């Protein structure tokens, strides 16, 4: 079958990246249709407006490009497979990454299945800044060409089979080029700002949002020396390395340096803080990760020299990875790293290739 007969369903979010993705695929000769996913049942007016506006933008783009737009409601799947897990992690004092879960459970599972089974798609496409390469009959996940926008960190749970069914047209471009194409086509999304915030929950204030689902659990804020200097409303509102929102100033006789969260004592509901962003207590020499996903589906044997990111947009850290068993690895950094956060993902790279990753179960502190 030539590309001209192959059918691609593009996940249309109402943003510029998916809009341009649809256009590029049409240019490449595919039969293109769009799909707008509704993944959250709104419970307030503001959020409803955002979702409605995004759908209207997606529809306007599809009309302009002359393609059909389907809609689907994955709110139940999102609640069961993303949101409940997200809350569980927060309750346990960890800091999960919902975008990674959402890509795993919704965009490259529910959407992929729906597109193939209900819409007869050969491929799905998204506006992610990643690339794929096919080597020896297996698809690899590569970083996006635009280093500032590369989103491979969020897609490490994909298997080579899922990548083989996915196209990422804007991954070959830099963001300014994408905006330029949208402007030349006079697409309504050309100047729309990039969405931030939790995938599908949008820009609302995170603390207020979390407070609806998890009761406040006030506790003490202690310094690394054990001095009590304040109270927190719940460990879930704080992440390692955070300095905003602690509500504490300098101590009477101490320095005026800002305070940073350096640890959470989940058992005793205590938030531990120190002054200075590079306090030794905040540094880790490595980590243990679990719930591993390797893109090539082959568990790690022995050790591996590669680089790792412990959060999005971090500079790659050279490291040595050692398999502890089939589902746990130990990672040792060449140099200590600040704010390695349990619940977040550690994602591994060999050059341009994203190998996979896992959830940080614990950090290996420089000093405890």
From Swiss-Prot:
Binding site for ATP: 11-18, 37, 127
Keyword Cytoplasm applies: yes
Active site, per annotation: 102 (nucleophile), 199 (cysteine persulfide intermediate)
InterPro entries in UniProt: MnmA-like, MnmA-like_C, MnmA-like_central, MnmA-like_central_sf, Rossmann-like_a/b/a_fold
Site keyed Interaction with tRNA: positions: 128, 344
Keywords: ATP-binding, Cytoplasm, Disulfide bond, Nucleotide-binding, RNA-binding, Transferase, tRNA processing, tRNA-binding
GO annotation, cellular component aspect: cytoplasm
UniProt EC number: 2.8.1.13
Localization per record: Cytoplasm
Biological process annotations from GO: tRNA wobble position uridine thiolation
Region spans: Interaction with tRNA: 149-151, 311-312
Region of interest (Interaction with target base in tRNA), residue spans: 97-99
Catalysis: reaction(s): S-sulfanyl-L-cysteinyl-[protein] + uridine(34) in tRNA + AH2 + ATP = 2-thiouridine(34) in tRNA + L-cysteinyl-[protein] + A + AMP + diphosphate + H(+)
Cross-referenced SUPFAM superfamilies: Adenine nucleotide alpha hydrolases-like
Pfam family, one: tRNA_Me_trans_M
Paired cysteines (S-S): 102-199
Example of a GO MF term: ATP binding
Its job: Catalyzes the 2-thiolation of uridine at the wobble position (U34) of tRNA(Lys), tRNA(Glu) and tRNA(Gln), leading to the formation of s(2)U34, the first step of tRNA-mnm(5)s(2)U34 synthesis. Sulfur is provided by IscS, via a sulfur-relay system. Binds ATP and its substrate tRNAs.
Family of the protein in this entry: Belongs to the MnmA/TRMU family.
NCBIfam families referenced in this protein's UniProt entry, alphabetically: PRK00143.1, trmU
Summary of subunit composition and partner proteins: Interacts with TusE.
Descriptive protein name: tRNA-specific 2-thiouridylase MnmA
